[in-house]
Amino acid sequence: LIQSPTSQNCLATTANVGPLVGRTLLVAICQFLIIPIPWVATDFYKWFVERLQLPRGERLAFIGKPEDMWHVFMLAALCGYAGFIPIPVLPLLLTPLTACLGLLIVRWFVSNLTADGRALPLRFAGAYWPYVGWTALGMVSFYTIVGWAWVYAAFMRWMCRNVEGTNTKIVFTGTGIEYLWRT
């Protein structure tokens, strides 16, 4: 998402690292607390998207409301507790549910984007089972210490390919090593 000096048709971001880290930590804490997560996540999406700029200088905005998806966010947060239960395979068994919730959030997010106040006719067309596969692969890849970065780079490419409703092709060009050195 960060525009390089040689790229002309990329999204650019004006988000500073300090506020981004602080807001990300706040989302993580509220994910743990469960109840505030719909409001904090929605606020984070609004804050971050407002700092994105399209190649022609248009400003993006996120218009989703917490009350649209509060139950999905809370259920997803509850699923996060599966790792604390002493059943090692429980997070993997919950993968179909967590993937379903994640897919609902992604579809909601994409459908609530605007550019310069105009609604964008975007939708996320990625199917459920591939999303489950990417979610499971992402979970398993964390055991490789560094392999997760390549998985998430490929996952982002898949997600971008599945955004429909624009004449412009959305492409993620990041690589695993670029993901890794930024974390």
Where are these regions (language model features)?
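Membrane-interface extramembranous regions at the lipid-water interface
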Residues: L1-L25, V40-L75, L103-W134, A153-R182
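Hydrophobic, aromatic-rich membrane-embedded alpha-helical segments
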Residues: T24-F44, Y81-C100, T135-A154
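Short, surface-exposed amphipathic charged segments that create phosphate/polyanion-binding patches used
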Residues: M74-A77, M139
